[in-house]
């Protein structure tokens, strides 16, 4: 069994989403001896943002510069990691009302027409179903249902939309929010998220 662990936070050891995503991976390792884990730190080793040159360079028989070819091959590697994974764990902080740009760059490499989705007579069809996806969404403020800022939350909502688009319709999402509202609020949010991580089912 293969697990892909992706972190999008820029805060390193101070990151709540990283702390909780690591706890999830540790729990799954304990539950699945022999679990193969691939880790992508998208802040430590950022992916280049998708460009027109790379889109063109990925076409059959394209003639690429070395830089573009390297980017094309990196994109293929990222996509293959995702396709090969049985479980995907994502650390997804909310920055300025949406995902980090580092995580968005990764998403742009896994949404590939004809591979993870396709268009048919009735619209788009996801092709990447069957994976277990667990995401940790950390938020500095309060954006949950019924809060004044709920409509400004575009991390969890975006993730759910993107994953459903490629066929993953039941992601497991753990939310830690209010982490910028003081030390006590941060500790409560982190403890609650870690409790939720500890309660995840084995398979």
UniProtKB/Swiss-Prot annotation:
- Which InterPro entries does the record match to this protein? Flavodoxin_fold (IPR003680), Flavoprotein-like_sf (IPR029039), FMN-dep_NADH:Q_OxRdtase_AzoR1 (IPR050104), NADH:quinone_OxRdtase_FMN_depd (IPR023048)
Give the EC number(s) listed in the UniProt record: 1.6.5.-, 1.7.1.17
Keywords associated with the record? Flavoprotein, FMN, NAD, Oxidoreductase
Cofactors demanded by this protein:
FMN
Matches recorded under Pfam families: Flavodoxin_2
Q: What does this protein's record comment on cofactor binding?
A: Binds 1 FMN per subunit.
Q: Which Gene3D superfamilies match?
A: 3.40.50.360
Q: Which residues bind FMN?
A: 9, 15-17, 138-141
Q: Report the function annotation for this chain.
A: Quinone reductase that provides resistance to thiol-specific stress caused by electrophilic quinones.
> What protein is this chain from?
FMN-dependent NADH:quinone oxidoreductase
Which GO molecular function annotations are given, in alphabetical order?
A: electron transfer activity; FMN binding; oxidoreductase activity, acting on NAD(P)H as acceptor; oxidoreductase activity, acting on NAD(P)H, quinone or similar compound as acceptor
Per the similarity annotation, which family is this? Answer: Belongs to the azoreductase type 1 family.
The entry describes its oligomerization and partners as: Homodimer.
| Catalytic activity of the protein | 2 a quinone + NADH + H(+) = 2 a 1,4-benzosemiquinone + NAD(+); N,N-dimethyl-1,4-phenylenediamine + anthranilate + 2 NAD(+) = 2-(4-dimethylaminophenyl)diazenylbenzoate + 2 NADH + 2 H(+)
Please list which residues make up the signal peptide. none
């Amino acid at each position: 069994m293969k697990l892909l662990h992706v972190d999008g936070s820029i805060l390193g050891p101070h990151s709540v989403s990283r702390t909780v995503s690591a706890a999830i991976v540790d729990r799954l390792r304990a539950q699945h001896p022999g679990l193969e884990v691939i880790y992508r730190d998208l802040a430590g080793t950022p992916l280049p943002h998708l460009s027109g040159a790379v889109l063109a360079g990925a076409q059959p028989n394209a003639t690429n510069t070395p830089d573009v070819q390297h980017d094309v091959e990196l994109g293929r590697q990222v996509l293959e990691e995702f396709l090969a994974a049985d479980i995907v764990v994502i650390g997804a902080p909310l920055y300025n009302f949406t995902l980090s740009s580092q995580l968005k760059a990764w998403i742009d490499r896994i949404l590939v027409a004809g591979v993870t989705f396709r268009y048919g007579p009735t619209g788009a069809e996801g092709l990447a179903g069957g994976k277990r996806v667990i995401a940790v969404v950390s938020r500095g403020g309060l954006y949950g249902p019924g809060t004044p800022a709920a409509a400004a939350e575009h991390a969890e909502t975006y993730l759910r939309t993107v994953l459903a688009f490629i066929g993953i319709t039941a992601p497991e999402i753990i939310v830690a929010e209010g982490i910028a509202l003081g030390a006590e609020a941060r500790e409560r949010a982190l403890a609650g998220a870690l409790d939720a991580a500890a309660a995840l089912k084995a398979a």
